[in-house]
Structures are given as C-alpha cells and as structure tokens.
Amino acid sequence: MSIVNIAAYKFVSLPDTVLLREALQERADALGLKGTILLAPEGINLFLAGSGEAIEAFLAGLRADARFADIEVKYSTSADVPFGKMRVRLKREIIRMNHPAIRPEAGRAPSVNAHTLARWLEQGRDDDGREVVMLDTRNAFEVDVGTFRNAIDWRIDRFTQFPDAVREHRAELEGKTVVSFCTGGIRCEKAAIFMEDIGIAHVYQLEGGILKYFEETGGPGYDGACFVFDERHALDPALKPV
C-alpha cells in the first residue's frame, strides 16, 4: 500500500491550543496517522502520513473547523511511513523567528505561484523586466541538499538568524525582484513580510514553497533535492525519496 504524506500550515489566531491539541491527537490516533502537528497562538503547521483514506478523513474533520476550511495541502507518497510517532505539540510560534510583530494573519507579502516563477526563471526577469533573485531562507544543511540555481544562501544555522542576515546583506537585494523560498512556504512567508517591513521593495514569497513548485512544475531551475524533516530525508523534483 502506498503511504500518503501531507504537509500544510495556516497562520490563524488560535486561542484554544490546549483543547485543540487534545482533539487533534485523539483524531489522528484513531485514524492510525503518524507525524507531527505544531500548534501556536499564530497558527498550525502539520506533517502527517498514513493511508489515503485516513488522511482525507483527518482533513475533512480539520476543515470542518472554519478556521482551517481553506488550509492548503501539499501531497507526496512513499512506500513506508516516514514517522515513528504521532505528536501534537504546543509552541510559541509555528516557525520561530523571535519577531512577534511579524503576524502573517494580519497581512501577507505578495506571492508568486509555481508556473509564474518557472517562467520568470526561464526569462531571467519578472514581468516588469527586473532581475529575479531567489533567496533561500532555509538552514545551511538543508541548502546543501539542493536549491534553486544561483540562489542567495547566507549560510544561516537557524531561522532566527534570518533578520540579521537580511540587514547585513540587503544591498544584494536592492533594485531586484526578490523571491523568498523554503520547503513548504511557512518560513518564506514570514521572511517576505520581514523584508517588506524594513523597506525592501519588490519582495515575493514562493506560494507553497519548494514542494508545491515540484508538484506543479517538476522543478525547472532547481538543482538537487529538497531536504525534509522526516525519515525520507530528501525528495527529488518528482516528490520521490532520494
């Protein structure tokens, strides 16, 4: 049986994380799912694996809560379940940046979809004629597995270092169209808002991250694989473990 893997997140106010944790843990356990769900006052971030039927049943229940009705999901498959346990964890942030003023729920930076980005990369410029630079917001060890060709990589060890790296290197970005990207979209969403907040113009986030880019385009302009935080370790542009 092929295992279905999903990744999804949403920035949305969650004042009831303790109760939500109990409900989601119970539902996931009942369906035999494995993986991790992170809950914080700012939203939800999840990585789950199981049978296709169980995954869809879980998502139906999740989307029955109006706060998650429009949550977008990225799918892949594997021969085995890449997680050993099912954990629902409470965190201060679903992706730690240590900048509480960055609240994606209050307003996102502009995004670029996979097909538009593929066209920009082929052209070498955006639709307004500006040079496009790809900014990798991931940790250095993730970048080493694969990244977009000629992407900017500041060799950060954790996402909390990103704001200082932007301030130090912002001259590299001035006058260009900057597309921030990450695995599934969550880090690049916060990164793009931060760059806008400090006055960098023409900033976009890659909608759905690398995984959605692979899913929709097959990965043109990307060299290598995409590191993932589970037992598969990395996925190729066909979303298969390498």
Swiss-Prot record:
Rhodanese domain: residues covered: 128-222
Residues forming the catalytic site: 182
Disulfide pattern: none
Catalyzed reactions per annotation: uridine(34) in tRNA + AH2 + O2 = 5-hydroxyuridine(34) in tRNA + A + H2O
GO biological-process terms attached to the record: tRNA modification
GO molecular function, one term: oxidoreductase activity, acting on paired donors, with incorporation or reduction of molecular oxygen
Keywords noted in UniProt: Oxidoreductase, tRNA processing
EC number: 1.14.-.-
HAMAP family: TrhO
Role description: Catalyzes oxygen-dependent 5-hydroxyuridine (ho5U) modification at position 34 in tRNAs.
NCBIfam families tied to this protein: PRK05320.1 (NF003703)
Name this polypeptide is given: tRNA uridine(34) hydroxylase
Organism encoding this protein: Bordetella avium (strain 197N)
